[in-house]
């Protein structure tokens, strides 16, 4: 089984936890391809799709008798397509076809009834190409960043509450979005200390989230015959639909002094009391994910100073070198864009004011957050950062003059 890392890895080292509920599941056997002929593997199997804690979508097949998961593929939107094979006489053979390369995986339906075959196929394609927003399972499969995507209770809490310090810094920390033009001030000086983060995040073995999905498919030694699936298993089952996880919030948190580090438990408590509306409150909503496009970020990320500040916060591991190219890959990854879209929607909801106050941000920024005015919030943070930038420039100039006087 082959897996790859992501921008937001599981919080438990070495763990890739997931919800007990699968997004979609149905009984199906595998088929082996030899030349132009496919042969059914008569073992009882289960095809299922699940979203792990790192928000990645996994397409899996397991042996129902042994319980062994033999195929576990990490799929990104537009990687592949699941469709029926019309050449099969029974009409119950489906193929997972990758758009890049010639990789194909064949399966034959083992459900006793055929009436759900097309529905299962539709759901597979929906979840593979339009993964649900983190914490909003059970909502529509749309991959957009509308405020409604925050879904029921716990959507926002699940996203931010499950992030480590370093992950939060990637969203709003001085070494995360810091330096990105006018929006760089979303960070604010000293936010790292407020979050209790004193250094780069710990290492975690991972690989590029943009890499092609891969899996090791066990070889099957069976005689080659035309595709004729074995009879379906007699037992009945139905696909389980995901349901939103209940909110784990425990009420409002006590106000912390701006000089005290804010822990993740404080963030969870604050977010637990929020009521994110199902739609925009009115007016034009600014989506940071649509603002920070690859075209806009490219010249900024070409700046060596910006690269130097961002590199320590990249996921690290043997298969993922910390390079300038990986900065681009990370900031354009689906996971980062999803998180950025949700943060933008939450900010526009007008309910992040108390949280920004906890960060010790300037009054103008807190007021803008209370109003849900993303543009005013960015300007307030930018204006707040200018005096410190001038102070730094003055200090550098003074040091330069001292060096010259020594000469």
UniProtKB/Swiss-Prot annotation:
Q: Where is the Pru domain?
A: 18-131
List the GO molecular function terms. endopeptidase activator activity; molecular function inhibitor activity; protease binding; proteasome binding
Q: A GO term (biological process) for this protein?
A: proteasome assembly
Phosphotyrosine found at: 127
Instruction: Give residue numbers for the modification (Phosphoserine).
Output: 15, 140, 211, 405
DEUBAD domain location, by residue?
277-391
Q: Read off the domain note.
A: The Pru (pleckstrin-like receptor for ubiquitin) domain mediates interactions with PSMD1 and ubiquitin. Preferential binding to the proximal subunit of 'Lys-48'-linked diubiquitin allows UCHL5 access to the distal subunit.
Would you tell me the protein name for this molecule?
Answer: Proteasomal ubiquitin receptor ADRM1
Q: Which organism encodes this protein?
A: Homo sapiens (Human)
Its encoding gene is what?
ADRM1
